[in-house]
UniProtKB/Swiss-Prot annotation:
<protein>
    <recommendedName>
        <fullName>Large ribosomal subunit protein uL3</fullName>
    </recommendedName>
</protein>
<keyword id="KW-0687">Ribonucleoprotein</keyword>
<comment type="subunit">
    <text>Part of the 50S ribosomal subunit. Forms a cluster with proteins L14 and L19.</text>
</comment>
<comment type="function">
    <text>One of the primary rRNA binding proteins, it binds directly near the 3'-end of the 23S rRNA, where it nucleates assembly of the 50S subunit.</text>
</comment>
<dbReference type="GO" id="GO:0022625">
    <property type="term" value="C:cytosolic large ribosomal subunit"/>
</dbReference>
<dbReference type="InterPro" id="IPR009000">
    <property type="entry name" value="Transl_B-barrel_sf"/>
</dbReference>
<dbReference type="GO" id="GO:0019843">
    <property type="term" value="F:rRNA binding"/>
</dbReference>
<comment type="similarity">
    <text>Belongs to the universal ribosomal protein uL3 family.</text>
</comment>
<keyword id="KW-0699">rRNA-binding</keyword>
<dbReference type="Pfam" id="PF00297">
    <property type="entry name" value="Ribosomal_L3"/>
</dbReference>
<dbReference type="InterPro" id="IPR000597">
    <property type="entry name" value="Ribosomal_uL3"/>
</dbReference>
<dbReference type="InterPro" id="IPR019926">
    <property type="entry name" value="Ribosomal_uL3_CS"/>
</dbReference>
<keyword id="KW-0694">RNA-binding</keyword>
<dbReference type="GO" id="GO:0006412">
    <property type="term" value="P:translation"/>
</dbReference>
<dbReference type="InterPro" id="IPR019927">
    <property type="entry name" value="Ribosomal_uL3_bac/org-type"/>
</dbReference>
<keyword id="KW-0689">Ribosomal protein</keyword>
<dbReference type="GO" id="GO:0003735">
    <property type="term" value="F:structural constituent of ribosome"/>
</dbReference>
């Protein structure tokens, strides 16, 4: 565990910017304008080091009493989303501290975690990339069927993990080693090179890259 930085944000969509060589660079814009530290965990009091972040406004009347007390203790207004990030560098943070987009420098490598788009119930071709049968004489509506999933004698069952039709998407996914193209402190927007998981308006967590280049 190292001195990792993190911000919660909302995916605004994609755009493109010019780089220094005159090429278009595809970027994803992430709003990180309302991040605040709601708690700091230390080894002395909690047994581990971490920082809890809050993001997004919420009606105070819709917050439970325990959470309302938690926010009041930190001296901040209630936040809709909370996340805890492990880091050794907890001394740089304190409850109530606001974090801006300049927490990440331009050119920094980050990992972005979000919830992928839900696709609903999907067949094996769309979900797993199976090959379809030939559309020719004798196939008889087998073009998109999965084929055999378990022989009758051996193994005489369907093994766990068998790739079959089912609900596709709406799972947590992380895209690693993306580059911060720009950090707009005034508007609280990060421009991240490439695509990140999730739809427009989805909540994402931007963290310092765990692997690096």
């Amino acid at each position: 565990m190292s001195n990792r930085k993190a911000l919660l944000g909302k995916k605004l969509g994609m755009s493109q910017v010019w780089d220094e060589n005159g090429f278009f660079v595809p970027v994803t814009l992430v709003d990180v304008s309302t991040n605040v530290v709601t708690a700091v965990k230390t080894e002395e009091s909690d047994g581990y080091k971490a920082v809890q972040l809050g993001y997004g406004a919420i009606d105070p009347t819709k917050v439970t009493k325990p959470l309302a007390g938690h926010f009041a203790k930190a001296g901040v207004t209630p936040r809709r989303h909370l996340v805890e990030v492990r880091t050794d560098d907890v001394d740089q943070f304190e409850a109530g501290q606001e974090l801006a987009a300049d927490l990440f420098e331009e050119g920094a490598e980050v990992d972005v975690t979000g919830t992928t788009k839900g696709k609903g119930f999907a067949g094996t071709i769309k979900r797993w990339g199976f090959k379809s049968y030939r559309r020719t004489h004798g196939s008889h509506k087998n073009e998109r069927r999965p084929g055999s999933v378990g022989a009758c004698a051996t193994p005489s069952r369907i093994l766990k993990g068998k790739r079959m039709a089912g609900r596709m998407g709406h799972v947590t996914a992380t895209t690693q080693n993306l580059i911060i193209v720009s950090a707009d402190v005034e508007n609280g927007i990060l421009a991240i090179k490439g695509a990140i998981p999730g739809p427009k308006g989805g909540i994402v967590l931007v963290r310092s890259a765990v692997k690096g280049a």
